Amino acid sequence: MAFLKKSLFLVLFLGLVPLFLCENEKREGENEKEENDDQSEEKRSLGSFMKGVGKGLATVGKIVADQFGKLLEAGKG
């Protein structure tokens, strides 16, 4: 009977150790995926910011061009 208990314990132990190792690897993989998601979110945020800056500069450029055009017309007349 003691032999069966030891065998059962050994089987359970050998079954749980790989399970534990697999779960650790799975957690590490999930953490890496979350880090990659965070980095891609930061890149998207930066892209949105740059897009907004570009639109703002375009608007300012139009205003400056209009004002410069008015100054040139006033100087001719």
From Swiss-Prot:
UniProt keyword annotations, A-Z: Amidation, Amphibian defense peptide, Antibiotic, Antimicrobial, Cleavage on pair of basic residues, Secreted, Signal
Signal peptide: 1-22
Tissue distribution of the protein: Expressed by the skin glands.
One Pfam family recorded for the sequence: FSAP_sig_propep
InterPro entries: Frog_antimicrobial_propeptide (IPR004275), FSAP (IPR016322)
GO BP terms: defense response to bacterium
Propeptide position ranges: 23-42
Keyword Oxidoreductase appears in the UniProt entry: no
Chief place where the protein resides: secreted
GO cellular component, as recorded: extracellular region
Protein localization: Secreted
Keyword field contains Signal: yes
Lysine amide modifications at: K76
Purpose: Possesses a potent antimicrobial activity against Gram-positive and Gram-negative bacteria. Probably acts by disturbing membrane functions with its amphipathic structure.
Family, similarity comment: Belongs to the frog skin active peptide (FSAP) family. Dermatoxin subfamily.
Protein name according to UniProt: Dermatoxin-DA1
